[in-house]
């Protein structure tokens, strides 16, 4: 089920305040956040946001094509190590 249009997108207040301060000051800093559920809004374009993946913060540069997506979509939480090999040695 999608979010109601009357509510608008969810963006964590602390994240939005930090982006507004950076836009007003004009500085280029990496914004660190744990809020993977926040929606990317046009105000964030051009900033680098470090998104937590459960172990570390991954720096992600926000572009205009990312608007409307969630921050967590760009920081994968699982590492794929490959499928099991299909030979005689690995079966033992």
From Swiss-Prot:
It comes from the Eukaryota. SUPFAM superfamilies: Ribosomal protein S19. It holds the Pfam family Ribosomal_S19. InterPro entries: Ribosomal_uS19 (IPR002222), Ribosomal_uS19_bac-type (IPR005732), Ribosomal_uS19_CS (IPR020934), Ribosomal_uS19_SF (IPR023575). Keywords: Plastid, Ribonucleoprotein, Ribosomal protein, RNA-binding, rRNA-binding. Its main location: plastid. Gene3D superfamilies: 30s Ribosomal Protein S19, Chain A. GO terms for molecular function: rRNA binding; structural constituent of ribosome. GO terms for biological process: ribosomal small subunit assembly; translation. It is found in: Plastid. One of its GO terms (cellular component) is mitochondrial small ribosomal subunit. Belongs to the universal ribosomal protein uS19 family. Protein S19 forms a complex with S13 that binds strongly to the 16S ribosomal RNA. This is Small ribosomal subunit protein uS19c. It comes from Aneura mirabilis. The gene is rps19.
């Amino acid at each position: 089920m999608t979010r109601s249009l009357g509510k608008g997108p969810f963006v964590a207040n602390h994240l939005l305040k930090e982006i507004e301060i950076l836009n007003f000051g004009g500085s280029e800093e990496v914004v660190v956040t744990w809020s993977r559920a926040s929606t990317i809004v046009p105000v964030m374009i051009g900033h680098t946001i470090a998104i937590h993946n459960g172990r570390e913060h991954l720096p992600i540069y926000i572009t205009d094509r990312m608007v409307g997506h969630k921050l967590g979509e760009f920081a994968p939480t699982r590492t794929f190590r490959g499928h099991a090999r299909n030979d005689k040695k690995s079966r033992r």
